[in-house]
Amino acid sequence: IGLFGLFTRLAYSINIKKNDFLIVQADWLRDKFSYMFKLSKNKFIVAPPQSNTSNNITSHKEKDDIYTFFYAATPDCHKNFELACKAAQMLEDELGKNRFKLILTINGTENKYAQWLYTQWGQVDSIKFHGFMNKESLYQHYAIADCLIFPSRVETWGLPITEFSQHKKPMLLADLPYAHETAAGSSQVAFFNPEKAEQLQKMMKTIINGNTSFMGEVPVKKIEEPMAKDWDTLFAILTHNKPTKNAKLI
């Protein structure tokens, strides 16, 4: 991740100051880039992605079903699947089997990282290596899950957080700037250190036992202009024209 970060910084720095505008997905990213490249914040347009989650998909989960955690991500090392797996393994060791399940959107065959994850934690009964999900299946799992876990170390915008938040259910998120901004306005959220599995494990145990008192609402921070919530507004800023219609950013 460190080498990738250095390469990314070098790539971005080439001709970056020659642009009239730069488009970013999040306000925290505007702050970082402005500081990193010594550019005015007014050169950055914040254009947050919009969710297309279907409100017609409802949960068919029975009341006495096992408590379900869900983590949706691609099998990349910065997604930090190992932290979620470690926490789940420790929780199963403490509570026993059939007390909860953690569903992952990888099956352990996608790449070397996924293979390593399955080798390390494929034997843990409470961890379900489901594999890739199409859009419909993903949204169905959002509806079925009791709680979203999102431990990713690096994101510009955590889209699964946006999508899951529409269900107004608990979320356990990495204590990082992207997660705070993406979850803004959500009412049942707790943040954990993305390097401490035992902290996540304790939160998972607490929520399984029906205690959500440690969770709270994430405050909404006003995003300064220039900011675009749809394509038309974005194009209007870029061309110095007035918006004429709405078109969601995806």
Which residues are covered by each model-predicted region?
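Conserved donor-binding/catalytic core segment of Leloir-type glycosyltransferases
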Residues: 62-79, 85-88, 103
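Conserved acidic donor-binding segment of nucleotide-sugar-dependent glycosyltransferases
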Residues: 189-198, 206-210
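Nucleotide-activated donor-binding/catalytic signature segment of Leloir-type glycosyltransferases, i.e.
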Residues: 114-136
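Aromatic "clamp/platform" in nucleotide-sugar-dependent glycosyltransferases that forms part
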Residues: 153
